[in-house]
Amino acid sequence: MAKKITRVAKLEFMAMQAKPGAELASLGINMPAFTREFNDATKDRAGDVVPVVITAYDDKSFDFVLKTTPTAYMLKKVAKIEKGASNSRTQTVATVTLDDIRSIAEYKMPDLNANTIEAAMKQVIGTAKNMGIKVTGMEDFK
């Protein structure tokens, strides 16, 4: 007989820094086991925010799927800024190159709703514009 799913939650933790807390307690899962497995699974992504989808079952067991780091976090890291512009229409807080956009899009491809790298790049460019980050080299991009 299949296990009954009690809850599915989308959370974000820093890689290798998941700790038992209120977010996990509300799921009713074995918190020490989750934190140990999550921290082991994210060893190669140290310092990054890691979104995770946790499926909790009625017997306190769980499954989780790691997602790619959020686009906004990656753009801030590449642009070396702490936060985006408060008004992206009038402020530019940083600039990034089209090559930076391409590398982010290639990394994010599995989680994006895009069939081509160009479509993924357009999504990343849209996020950058909304954050007040200017993209250089756009004349080469269609």
Curated annotation (Swiss-Prot):
<dbReference type="InterPro" id="IPR000911">
    <property type="entry name" value="Ribosomal_uL11"/>
</dbReference>
<comment type="subunit">
    <text>Part of the ribosomal stalk of the 50S ribosomal subunit. Interacts with L10 and the large rRNA to form the base of the stalk. L10 forms an elongated spine to which L12 dimers bind in a sequential fashion forming a multimeric L10(L12)X complex.</text>
</comment>
<comment type="similarity">
    <text>Belongs to the universal ribosomal protein uL11 family.</text>
</comment>
<keyword id="KW-0699">rRNA-binding</keyword>
<keyword id="KW-0694">RNA-binding</keyword>
<dbReference type="GO" id="GO:0006412">
    <property type="term" value="P:translation"/>
</dbReference>
<dbReference type="Pfam" id="PF03946">
    <property type="entry name" value="Ribosomal_L11_N"/>
</dbReference>
<protein>
    <recommendedName>
        <fullName>Large ribosomal subunit protein uL11</fullName>
    </recommendedName>
</protein>
<dbReference type="InterPro" id="IPR020783">
    <property type="entry name" value="Ribosomal_uL11_C"/>
</dbReference>
<keyword id="KW-0689">Ribosomal protein</keyword>
<keyword id="KW-0687">Ribonucleoprotein</keyword>
<dbReference type="InterPro" id="IPR036769">
    <property type="entry name" value="Ribosomal_uL11_C_sf"/>
</dbReference>
<dbReference type="GO" id="GO:0070180">
    <property type="term" value="F:large ribosomal subunit rRNA binding"/>
</dbReference>
<dbReference type="InterPro" id="IPR006519">
    <property type="entry name" value="Ribosomal_uL11_bac-typ"/>
</dbReference>
<dbReference type="GO" id="GO:0022625">
    <property type="term" value="C:cytosolic large ribosomal subunit"/>
</dbReference>
<dbReference type="GO" id="GO:0003735">
    <property type="term" value="F:structural constituent of ribosome"/>
</dbReference>
<dbReference type="InterPro" id="IPR020784">
    <property type="entry name" value="Ribosomal_uL11_N"/>
</dbReference>
<dbReference type="InterPro" id="IPR036796">
    <property type="entry name" value="Ribosomal_uL11_N_sf"/>
</dbReference>
<dbReference type="InterPro" id="IPR020785">
    <property type="entry name" value="Ribosomal_uL11_CS"/>
</dbReference>
<comment type="function">
    <text>Forms part of the ribosomal stalk which helps the ribosome interact with GTP-bound translation factors.</text>
</comment>
<dbReference type="Pfam" id="PF00298">
    <property type="entry name" value="Ribosomal_L11"/>
</dbReference>
<keyword id="KW-0488">Methylation</keyword>
